[in-house]
Amino acid sequence: MNHRIDERIVVTGLGVVCPAGVGLEAFWLSILRGTSSIREKTFFPNAGSRGRAAGIAQFEPATQFSWSDIPKAEGQDRLFRIAQTAIDEALAHAGLAGAAGAGDRADMGLYISSAIGPMATMEAIVRERLRGDLRDPGIWRTFSFGRIASLLASRCDLGGPYAVLPTGCAGGCDALGYGLSAIRSGAVDRAVVGAFEAPVTPLVEAAFARINATSSRDCPPKGASCPFDTKRPASGCTSLPDRRSVWLWRWCRPAR
């Protein structure tokens, strides 16, 4: 690989699964219209909850997650499904999906951020184990942050190095910077980067409510998010960066 530290890196593909829209086009139209993405949460009972609204992507995974049972197969958590869908869209947007892009994906890196990981699965496992034997030598894999990237890399057919940065709210920026550094250092020619969360779970909501970070505003759900209102009660995308030389050679279009 022939790299220069000052070589310009470009974004050639984007993918989005978020409350404002599933898919890049739907997301962008929602942003332009200024549509509120806050809705009443229905994932679990509101009894005892401080707030009843949340920003939840209108996204139904192929395999539904059951709150009463542990998923039968690893990777059925909503977080994985959201991440895989966003990555697939970014690869398609960059012209690297399917058999045509298999060669480029063979050494493609994956650098992502998730602050809490597959929390829904973690909570389900803990509830199940509390009713029986807590010992399970293989359970650590589900709680391992590295497993998130490992599973996604396998499912999306990405053969390069991967890493998970659990750095919190700014994790998407960290992942982007990590991918940029990896390309400039010569570790990879191209990489998928992004941030993924599926935090609407009983434990996560309770934790945020405990520090008064959830809205208790008495209003319809769409009005619960008001960050610039003086009376406010409280206070995620995937992209595919690429070396410019590779982008020019492949005639890809830069992000607009």
Residue ranges and their predicted role:
Residues 44-97, 112, 147-159:
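A glycine- and small-residue-enriched flexible loop/hinge segment at structural boundaries
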Residues 31, 56, 63, 114, ...:
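Structured, active/binding-site neighborhoods that engage oxygen-rich ligands
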Residues 2-6, 22, 36, 92-106, ...:
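Acyl-thioester C-C bond-transforming condensing/cleaving domain
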Residues 14, 113-115, 248:
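Structured loops at beta-to-helix junctions and adjacent beta-edge loops in soluble globular domains
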Residues 16, 76, 165:
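Generic anion/oxyanion-binding catalytic loop in active/binding sites
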Residues 1-73, 251-256:
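ACP-dependent fatty acid/polyketide chain-elongation machinery
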Residues 10, 109-113:
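Short, conserved beta-strand segments within well-ordered enzyme catalytic domains
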